Amino acid sequence: MAKKSVIQRNINRLKLINKYSAQREAIKNEIKRTSKVEKKISLYSNISRLPRDSSKVRLRSRCWVTGRGRSVYKNFGLSRHMFRFMASNGLLPGVVKSSW
């Protein structure tokens, strides 16, 4: 189980991403449309003034059961440990252990 503070930090990042996503996208679209270098530099400085945690890159995908941040399957939202446990106990519909 991940520490509660780490899970909460990720939740706070998600809130910041939702709050600043429209503003960040507007600036990025304006950068794409602009051809003047001076204007692009000023727009990049506008992006850098936004909170760092409002960037989507800083969000960590975590297991929804344990909060583990590594080896998380995106399709299920589970870490490899919980995926194996739940699949072997038949808790994931449609998942069958392969054998050949």
Curated annotation (Swiss-Prot):
Binds 16S rRNA, required for the assembly of 30S particles. Coiled coil: none annotated. This is Small ribosomal subunit protein uS14c. It is found in: Plastid, Chloroplast. GO terms for molecular function: rRNA binding; structural constituent of ribosome. InterPro entries: Ribosomal_uS14, Ribosomal_uS14_bac/plastid, Ribosomal_uS14_CS. One of its GO terms (cellular component) is chloroplast. Keywords: Chloroplast, Plastid, Ribonucleoprotein, Ribosomal protein, RNA-binding, rRNA-binding. GO terms for biological process: translation. Gene3D superfamilies: 1.10.287.1480. Signal peptide: none annotated. Pfam families: Ribosomal_S14.
